[in-house]
Amino acid sequence: MTSLGGFHFGRAVLPLLLETEKASPEFPPTLIFTSATAAMRGGANFASFATGKFAMRALSQSLAREFGPQGIHVVHAIIDGVIDIPRTKEWKFDKPDAKISPEAIADSYWHLHTQPRTSFTHEFDIRPYCEKW
C-alpha cells in the first residue's frame, strides 16, 4: 500500500498545491514522500517492503518531473534509522545520539521547503552518524 497511498495522496493534493503556487513564490509548494533505504536496495526477507519503497521513489521522481516545471517541489526523503520517539525511548544503542531526533527531521524538511526554485533537492537521506548503510 506504500506506493498506492502515495499515488492517491499526490492525486488529491497536487491540484491544491498548483493553486497555491502563484500565491507563495518565496516558498514553493512542497510535497515530501518519506521513504527508507529499501527504496535504493532490497534486503533479504524484505521483498514486499522494498517493492513498495522502490515504487514510491519512482512515483516521486515522476511527479517531480511532471510538476517541477509548474513550480511544485517534490522530494523523496529517505529516513534510515530509529527515530527517537516515545515508543523507542527504551531502545538502547552502543553509541550516543544513535537515534534520529524528530526535531532534526523537521528542520531538514523545513530546509527542503524553503529552497529556491533554482536549487530544488529531489532526493536526500537522513541517518545518524553511526547507522550502517
Q: Where are these predicted regions, by residue range?
A:
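Short acidic, glycine/proline-rich loop/turn micro-motifs
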Residues: A44-F46, R87-K92
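C-terminal helical subdomain
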Residues: P69-I72, H76-D84, W91-W133
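Catalytic loop of short-chain dehydrogenase/reductase
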Residues: L18, K22-A55, Q61, R65-G68, ...
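Hydrophobic positions on the long internal alpha-helix
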Residues: F9-V13, L17, S60
